[in-house]
Structures are given as C-alpha cells and as structure tokens.
Amino acid sequence: MARSLKKAPFVANHLLEKVERLNTQGDKKVIKTWSRSSTIVPLMIGHTIAVHNGREHIPVFITDQMVGHKLGEFAPTRTFRGHVKKDKKSKR
C-alpha cells in the first residue's frame, strides 16, 4: 500500500541532517547509511550514498530520476547465481 499523500516522505533524521550539512558546505563526501527505507528527496541529488545490503555498503549515486524511490531499491540484498543447467548426459 502506498504512503498517504497527507504525510511527508520518510527520511531518517540523521541522514537528512548529514545531507543538509554537506549541501551547506558544498562538499560531496560518501554518506554511509543503514536506512534502506528512507525515501530519496531532491536534497540528495548529486550525492553518493553508501546503502547497506546486509553485508557491505553499496555506493549509490543519486540522480533526479531516483526521487521518490527508496534507497534500498538500489542496493540488492540477494545474489542470483543463475539456474542449474540441465545435464541430459548424466541421466543416462
């Protein structure tokens, strides 16, 4: 279910403070975060945010097309190694 339009998008307070601080300084450092559920807002455009995927931090460069999506959408948690190929020779 989508979030109500009456409410503001969820962004973790600590993440929002770091982005605002870097915007005032004009700095473009990588921001590490575990907050996968935070929504990408226009303040974040141009920054690189390292999103935790359960094992490591995946750097995500924020563009204007990402606004409105969640940070966790861009850091996959599962690695797909492909399906097992059927081997007809071993069945004989």
From Swiss-Prot:
The GO biological-process annotations, alphabetized, read as: ribosomal small subunit assembly; translation
Molecular functions (GO terms): rRNA binding; structural constituent of ribosome
Keywords, in A-Z order: Chloroplast, Plastid, Ribonucleoprotein, Ribosomal protein, RNA-binding, rRNA-binding
Q: Does the keyword Chloroplast apply?
A: yes
What domain of life? Eukaryota
Which PROSITE patterns did the record assign?
RIBOSOMAL_S19 (PS00323)
- The primary site where this protein sits is plastid
Q: Which family, according to UniProt?
A: Belongs to the universal ribosomal protein uS19 family.
Q: What is this protein called?
A: Small ribosomal subunit protein uS19c
Q: Which organism is it from?
A: Chlorella vulgaris (Green alga)
